[in-house]
């Protein structure tokens, strides 16, 4: 039941405070600097490190995360995937979840245009797709309001020690199969995506409906937010790793109506491949196979401007096959234009593609 979470956002939203104060079973590693011996296993005195002593290990200020050992990140990747690590001759199991919190110093729009939402991480982690793919969830810290005096309630609440111990006891249970009664996940989710989403469904259900009694619509809301949080990770992996992570169109299907619902992330814009309504003049969408043989959606744009009758191609780069197809298509059109009177008036104009 290990869980790997990332939350990056503006300052003063309580990111560090939660992991430092809300539970006696979590520890906040300030500054991010640590060693393999401190975090995992000390070979000299044969003692397990922080992951064996705490339920949650949170790294504050991800930009400063640094291992003094060269193999630190590799060991962390293995632990994040399986909840186990090897030191010496032994393989050691631990139950601590990994949390990474930090600040974003630019707007989300700027990050999406210039780099990725994992940009605050050090380069050896923020560009390592194997490490980032092990992140189950990315909480959008920019959507969380900053704390102010009126953010706190005057009503009664649980003492944090009681609440944390109650939630700790619930770790023994799993609600990840509750969704199977009403929904099933789409085929764009691979095994790692499915594990991440099911972990989140179980966690949200424990927080909101700890008795496990949840209606279909209540569960639908949990499924959608879980898909969004995992898709945010996958969208950034696609930016960093390219088409290896092409399958980002996360969805779920209603078992009663068989209707498939797609879930997008707000900062990426619309969740539909083709926008609703009429296309702009000169635009058309089509489905075709790319060079790899994979089906994809393509948008073709054309524009006619006064010219000298020559054919000019733009926007297709150095793709030789695409150039050849455009050339042959125009030659065919040029050879067949005479029977069509409507084309006569346009012949002395330049076509841009």
Which positions does each model-derived feature cover?
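P-loop NTPase catalytic core of nucleic-acid-dependent motor ATPases
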Residues: 1-27
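AAA+/P-loop NTPase substrate/partner-engagement loops
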Residues: 17-58, 62-69
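Conserved Walker
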Residues: 45-48, 81-96, 111, 119-128
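AAA+/SF3 P-loop NTPase mechanochemical coupling elements
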Residues: 49-53, 85-103, 133, 345-349
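Conserved AAA+/SF3 P-loop NTPase catalytic/coupling segment centered on the Walker-B
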Residues: 53-79, 93-96, 103-114, 130-131
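A short helix-turn-beta junction within AAA+ P-loop NTPase domains corresponding to the substrate/partner-engaging
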Residues: 112-146
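C-terminal helical "lid" subdomain and adjoining coupling/linker elements of P-loop NTPases
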Residues: 150-151, 177-252, 256-258, 262-277, ...
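Conserved P-loop NTPase/AAA+ ATPase motor core
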Residues: 263-353
